[in-house]
């Protein structure tokens, strides 16, 4: 049962290092592409949100880019208005219609 020993003297260290370098480069390239993809997505959402805010002067729903819609003196920002749910103030009628 002692025949299960391995002999590593014939392993070429240059090919081992070369393989490790190739794997490291591939993993690094993949990580860089993922990071740049996320950065490009953030800037694309910011650009679309800014264009929507400039074009439309009423309240917009800016899905996916809410952090960029919160600008000062921006009436169209979804965060500029506070919607109070009806279950918080059940006795208060906030509708614009007058009761009969």
UniProtKB/Swiss-Prot annotation:
Localization annotation = Virion membrane
Q: Name one GO molecular function term.
A: channel activity
Q: Which GO terms describe its cellular component?
A: host cell membrane; membrane; virion membrane
For this chain's UniProt record, which GO biological process terms are given?
A: proton transmembrane transport
Disulfide bonds listed in the record: none
Ranges in the topological domain labelled Virion surface: 1-18
Among InterPro entries, the record links this protein to: InfluenzaB_glycoprotein_NB
Q: Where does this protein chiefly localize?
A: virion
Task: Give ranges for the Intravirion compartment.
Answer: 41-100
- Record membrane topology: Single-pass type III membrane protein
**What family name appears in the similarity comment?**
Belongs to the influenza viruses type B glycoprotein NB family.
How this chain assembles, per its entry, is: Dimer.
Q: What is this protein called?
A: Glycoprotein NB
Q: Which organism is it from?
A: Influenza B virus (strain B/Maryland/1959)
């Amino acid at each position: 049962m002692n025949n299960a020993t391995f002999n590593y003297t014939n392993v070429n260290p240059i090919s081992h290092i070369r393989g490790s370098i190739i794997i490291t480069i591939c993993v690094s390239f993949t990580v860089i592409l993922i990071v740049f993809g996320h950065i490009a997505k953030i800037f694309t959402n910011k650009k679309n949100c800014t264009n929507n805010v400039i074009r439309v002067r009423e309240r917009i729903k800016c899905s996916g880019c809410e952090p960029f819609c919160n600008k000062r003196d921006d009436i169209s920002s979804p965060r500029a208005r506070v919607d109070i749910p009806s279950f918080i103030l059940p006795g208060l009628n906030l509708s614009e219609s007058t009761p009969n």
